Amino acid sequence: MLEVKLPGLDLKNPIIPASGCFGFGKEFSRFYDLSCLGAIMIKATTKEPRFGNPTPRVAETGAGMLNAIGLQNPGLDSVLHHELPWLEQFDTPIIANVAGSQVDDYVEVAEHISKAPNVHALELNISCPNVKTGGIAFGTNPEMAADLTKAVKEVSDVPVYVKLSPNVANITEIALAIEEAGADGLTMINTLIGMRLDLKTGKPILANKTGGLSGPAVKPVAIRMVYEVSQMVNIPIIGMGGVQTAEDALEFLLAGASAVAVGTANFVNPFACPEIIEQLPSVLLQYGYQSIEECIGRSWNHEKQPAHHRA
C-alpha cells in the first residue's frame, strides 16, 4: 500500500527524514530501527570539514524555528569511511546531500559519494540560505542551477535530485531549467529566509543575522510550490516543509509529491517519522485511497479518483 518507486529508489514507504534534521542517523537509532524508513537523507557533505556558523545558530519562532547552522559536517572522507559504512547495517537506501562553494566542489563530492554501496541517489543542495558562498546562489539562477546539475550528472553513478529554494520569484522556471539539464527528480522546499530580533539588545538573535525558517509556518508555501511545479515537470518530487503528521504527508502527495521528507518535526519528536509511517495507511483509507500512487497529484489531476468514488 505504501510502496513508491522513484529513480534509484525503491521505497517501502514514502516517508524520509530530511537532510539536516537527522544527522547521519546515529542519535535516532537509539529510539527506533532505521530500517523502517523509506530512505534517509543524510546531512549535507562538503569536500572539506565545515565547522558551520558562529553561535547562536538556532532560534524558535511561533510556528517553527530559524536555523543558521552553515552546513556543519565532518567532510567527504569522514562520511565515506565512517558515516556511510555505519549506515550499511540498515535496510534503507541513502540519499546523500551534496554541497559546495563552487561547481568543482560539488562534482568532486558527487563523484566519490555516489560510488558508496548504500547511496542510491544524490540530493544537490543548491538552496542553503546560510552560507556565504555557493549554496543559494546556485538555486536562484536558472542557468547556474542547470550548469551545476549537468556537471554532477556527468560524474554521478546514481540518480540526481536537486533541492529547490523557495526564495525565488519563479520556482517553476528554476525547476524546468534543472529538468532540462537532466535531473532525475526534485526535492522541495528548502527553508525560507527569516530573522528574529532580541528585544533587550535590539539586535538579531542569530549570529548570522538571518536564518532558514522551517516547521509548520512554511507548509502552505511548500504545498503551493509543489502544486505548481508538479504540473509543469515530468520528474518526481520529494515534498517537504512543515510535515508533522500523516495528514500533512497526504496533503503533499495530493499536491503532486511522490514522497515526503520530515524535517523540523524530528527535533520536537524523535519518533515523528515512524509514527507517520504507522498512521499513514489508516489516513489513506479514511480518505478513500488504496495506494500512494492514487494520491499523487490528485489535487490537480482530477482523473485520479479515490477508490470509493470509482464505479
UniProtKB/Swiss-Prot annotation:
GO cellular component terms attached to this protein's record: cytoplasm
Q: In the UniProt record, does the keyword Protein biosynthesis occur?
A: no
Q: Which UniProt keywords apply?
A: Cytoplasm, Flavoprotein, FMN, NAD, Oxidoreductase, Pyrimidine biosynthesis
Residues reported to bind substrate:
K43, N67, A68, I69, G70, L71, N125, N190, T191
* Repeat among keywords: no
Indicate which residues the UniProt annotation says bind FMN: S19, K43, A44, N97, N125, K163, I189, G215, G241, G242, G263, T264
Q: Which Pfam families match?
A: DHO_dh (PF01180)
Query: Which Gene Ontology MF annotations are present?
Result: dihydroorotate dehydrogenase (NAD+) activity; dihydroorotate dehydrogenase activity
- State the needed cofactors, names only: FMN
Family to which this protein belongs: Belongs to the dihydroorotate dehydrogenase family. Type 1 subfamily.
User: Do you know which PANTHER family this protein is assigned to?
Assistant: DIHYDROOROTATE DEHYDROGENASE (FUMARATE), DIHYDROOROTATE DEHYDROGENASE (QUINONE), MITOCHONDRIAL-RELATED
Q: What does this protein do?
A: Catalyzes the conversion of dihydroorotate to orotate with NAD(+) as electron acceptor.
Name of the protein described by the UniProt record: Dihydroorotate dehydrogenase B (NAD(+)), catalytic subunit
Which species is this UniProt entry from? Bacillus subtilis (strain 168)
